[in-house]
Amino acid sequence: MRLNSLSPAEGAKHSAKRLGRGIGSGLGKTGGRGHKGQKSRTGGGVRRGFEGGQMPLYRRLPKFGFTSLKSFHVAEIRLNDLAKVDGNEVTLESLKAANVITKDILSVKVILAGKIEKAVVVKGLGVTKGAKAAIEAAGGSIEE
């Protein structure tokens, strides 16, 4: 098999419409665009959301919500991510070194998701009640 011999399966592609090639083609003269009007012209058409001058739906509805800038620097990790760290001490730096979180993350919270078999010491990370119970049940501990 060579790249120059590859071709799509038979019937997988439709041939393009050949417009403006005479009456007999069925797509001559106006080429399927109808008569006159903005949509018949070259480059004609209206932008997305345009409703002919009527106030468009996206402007009739109220604004709501916002994106917290904090969300770009805070991460949630699962219990099974703790096992990816070398050694038994889990800190912000050790999570970055193990590529569990990206370098720009400033704080982390451990949530109750996944399983943990390894006893680990969690230092300086946020931990939910359920995650704390699971870590302590596995023989680990949490330090502030």
Curated annotation (Swiss-Prot):
InterPro entries: Ribosomal_uL15, Ribosomal_uL15/eL18, Ribosomal_uL15/eL18_sf, Ribosomal_uL15_bac-type, Ribosomal_uL15_CS. Gene3D superfamilies: 3.100.10.10. Keywords: Ribonucleoprotein, Ribosomal protein, RNA-binding, rRNA-binding. The keyword Cytoplasm does not apply. One of its GO terms (cellular component) is cytosolic large ribosomal subunit. GO terms for molecular function: rRNA binding; structural constituent of ribosome. HAMAP family: Ribosomal_uL15. Binds to the 23S rRNA. Belongs to the universal ribosomal protein uL15 family. PANTHER family: 50S RIBOSOMAL PROTEIN L15, LARGE RIBOSOMAL SUBUNIT PROTEIN UL15M. This is Large ribosomal subunit protein uL15. It comes from Actinobacillus pleuropneumoniae serotype 5b (strain L20).
